[in-house]
Amino acid sequence: MKHFAYSILGCLLLSLNAAFAQKTWSFDGQDPLLSSDGKSLLNLYTIKEIPEFVTGVEGKALRTDGYSTWMDTTTEGDVSSLSGWFALESYPTDTAAFMGIRDMAGTSVAVCVDRYGELLLGMGQNGSYSYCSLKTKVDRFKWLHVVLDLSNESVCLNGQR
């Protein structure tokens, strides 16, 4: 799944909701990879000398393709949900994730898109994945708000389950 993202224009706001805390990143400010509470850092992997920050839904967004530029982070405690804003410039050449989460045992769940723009829920264990259609298609060059709600075992797209 090429580092959980591919052909993504940007992620404006990534939220990790734990039982008692919420971590948010806006990409604005002096250190755009530092969470709003100043305690968590996104790890940025890129072959570019300077990461490309672009205009997002609100504020800045990181332009990434999931292959040459992507991000990850480690969280403490249980995570109940992930959310983020994404916009595709093109569809990936293979199924790729907008965002996902993996536990210490190697079990993962991710919201993905295929090469035709169909959204999928990807579930895997140690690199072996299976996908279930979310029965919706993503338009290119339009912002999409994605919420992966682990507590309620659901995915919300632009506020709709």
Feature roles, as predicted:
Residues K142-S151, V155:
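Short tryptophan-centered beta-strand motifs in secreted/extracellular beta-sheet-rich domains
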Residues N17-A21:
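Sec/Tat signal peptide C-region and signal peptidase I cleavage site
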Residues M123-L144:
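Short, aromatic/His-centered strand-loop micro-motif at the edge of beta-sheets
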Residues S7-S15:
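Bacterial N-terminal signal peptides
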Residues N158-R161:
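Short, solvent-exposed beta-strand-to-loop segments that form ligand-recognition rims
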